[in-house]
């Protein structure tokens, strides 16, 4: 499904600010894989997501999705088949538009429809039914501007918008980090349910080591712009946060330097 081969990315090459963000990075995901990614600050996690999403082109290597080479496909074209959620719950929705209008835009874009088309009554009922699955009462507030929603409600809505037409790939970039613990747990439950029920191929960056081991079917750890650990199956089932950290240190000779990760 997703096949990344030997991509590298250096920012500001040849200057005092030169930064090697990705180094000969390779990754293969099968359809329906749900892989969590952890790593210290500067490990290359966000750069990886930006490369996959098409925010910039990698210096070397290739990226294929569903058998199609997208290495040089523009970002706006990739967004039709790649869904993405960011850490900031305000990123991903139009605050001055209603819930219904936000859903309509997401639906028409993902289904390759005309964004200026009228939404049918059947589509509106579909939106209402999908909103009810969030269990937040949003199905009764479809005419309300999104800017009036809480951060958790907006993030749940963004998740729904990104998956209402299942994408070929879903990128979750610490999408619950800015939420309070109770809301974060609810959004994570929604995430796991939607991803598993729709068999969506998913990559999720998290700072929470427990989440990294409990969610999905693979855990990847990054350092210095490449994967240093990839655990799945029985090895992952028997792994604890302590053993994950110890394995990272043994494999890299480094300690995790992000206190927020270690304390989660």
Each language-model region and where it sits:
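Conserved beta-strand-loop-alpha-helix hinge in the C-terminal portion
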Residues: 226-252
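ABC ATPase C-loop
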Residues: 162-163
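The feature captures the beta-strand-to-loop junction immediately N-terminal to the Walker
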Residues: 38-40
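H-loop/switch region of ABC-family ATPase nucleotide-binding domains
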Residues: 206-207
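ABC ATPase NBD coupling module
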Residues: 15, 69-83, 91, 113-120, ...
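Helix-to-loop junction immediately C-terminal to a conserved catalytic motif
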Residues: 53
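A short, flexible loop at the N-terminus of ABC-type nucleotide-binding domains that lies
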Residues: 1, 10-24, 74
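Conserved ABC transporter NBD signature motif
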Residues: 61-69, 229-231
């Amino acid at each position: 499904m997703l096949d990344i081969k030997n991509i590298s990315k250096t920012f500001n090459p040849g200057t005092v600010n030169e930064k090697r963000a990705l180094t000969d990075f390779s990754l293969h995901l099968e359809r329906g894989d749900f892989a969590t990614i952890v790593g210290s600050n500067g490990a290359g996690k966000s750069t990886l997501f930006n490369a996959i999403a098409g925010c910039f082109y990698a210096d070397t290597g290739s990226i294929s999705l569903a058998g199609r080479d997208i290495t040089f496909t523009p970002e706006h074209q990739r967004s039709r088949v790649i869904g993405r959620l960011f850490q900031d719950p305000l990123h991903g929705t139009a605050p001055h538009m209603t819930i219904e209008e936000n859903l309509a835009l997401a639906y028409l874009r993902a289904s390759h429809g005309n964004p200026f088309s009228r939404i049918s009554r059947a589509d509106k009922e579909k939106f209402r039914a999908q909103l009810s699955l969030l269990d937040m009462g949003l199905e009764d507030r479809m005419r309300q501007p999104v800017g009036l929603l809480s951060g958790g409600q907006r993030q749940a809505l963004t998740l729904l918008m990104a998956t209402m037409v299942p994408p070929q790939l879903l990128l979750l970039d610490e999408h619950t980090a800015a939420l309070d613990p109770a809301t974060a747990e609810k959004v994570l439950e929604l995430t796991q349910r939607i991803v598993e029920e729709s068999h969506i191929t998913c990559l999720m960056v998290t700072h929470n080591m427990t989440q990294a081991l409990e969610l999905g079917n693979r855990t990847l750890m990054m350092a210095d712009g490449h994967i240093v650990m990839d655990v799945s199956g029985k090895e992952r089932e028997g792994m604890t946060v302590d053993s994950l950290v110890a394995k990272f240190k043994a494999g890299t000779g480094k300690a995790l330097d992000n206190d927020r990760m270690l304390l989660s």
